[in-house]
């Protein structure tokens, strides 16, 4: 390796441009073969860096979301359930207006309808568009909130979710109807009312 190349590697490492560091040489050869100008070469290399960062961020956001795997709109069988409006679901997935306005979405119906699939698919698309989401089995979240309440940190636990514009409460109908469980859930929903969005799925209307 030539001295200036070694220095460049050190500089790129210092700038935390790891994809630049790994690809500048191959990108240079490609740019030469295409007769790119210096600015075109730099733009091409920046594109590689950006694509890598977007991919890395997407992987991190999907992992953080705890969404069920392989639940996308393309994998949902709309033909098997004529009561589900594909265009309407697609519009909810593609547009951010309802989330920006802190509207909520309730998906209810009989078992086997694919409510969790639809909710997860909408949320997955939101992640692809750069939005943070979080999926919860409602009964599990209630347990977390109950423990937090016993430890006098319920408000703190609820506020932690403020950084997530969209959360999914799956199978809310399975939450026991006793006061302890419903009260913490009520506090969460009230806290997010008109500030952040929730998708709720349930077997009961």
Language-model features: locations:
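Walker A (P-loop) ATP-phosphate-binding motif of ABC ATPase nucleotide-binding domains
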Residues: 104
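Walker A/P-loop
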Residues: 97, 107-131
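Conserved hydrophobic/aromatic pocket- or pore-lining residues that grip, position, or stack substrates
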Residues: 76, 119, 137
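Charged, compositionally biased N-terminal leader segments and the immediate start
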Residues: 1-21
């Amino acid at each position: 390796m030539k001295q200036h190349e070694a220095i460049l590697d050190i500089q790129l490492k210092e700038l935390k441009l790891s994809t630049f560091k790994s690809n500048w040489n191959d990108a240079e050869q490609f740019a030469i073969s295409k007769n790119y100008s210096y600015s075109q070469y730099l733009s091409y290399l920046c594109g590689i860096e950006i694509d890598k960062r977007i991919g890395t961020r997407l992987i991190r956001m999907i992992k953080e979301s705890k969404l069920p795997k392989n639940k996308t709109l393309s994998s949902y069988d709309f033909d098997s359930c004529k009561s589900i409006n594909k265009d309407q679901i697609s519009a909810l997935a593609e547009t951010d207006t309802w989330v920006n306005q802190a509207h909520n979405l309730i998906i209810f119906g009989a078992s086997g309808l694919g409510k969790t699939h639809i909710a997860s698919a909408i949320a997955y698309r939101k992640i692809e568009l750069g939005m943070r989401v979080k999926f919860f089995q409602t009964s599990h979240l209630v347990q977390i909130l109950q423990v937090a309440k016993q430890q006098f940190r319920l408000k703190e636990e609820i506020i932690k979710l403020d950084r997530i514009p969209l959360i999914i409460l799956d199978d809310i109908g399975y939450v026991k109807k006793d006061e302890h469980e419903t009260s913490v859930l009520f506090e969460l929903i009230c806290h997010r009312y008109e500030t952040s969005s929730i998708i709720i799925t349930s077997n009961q209307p």
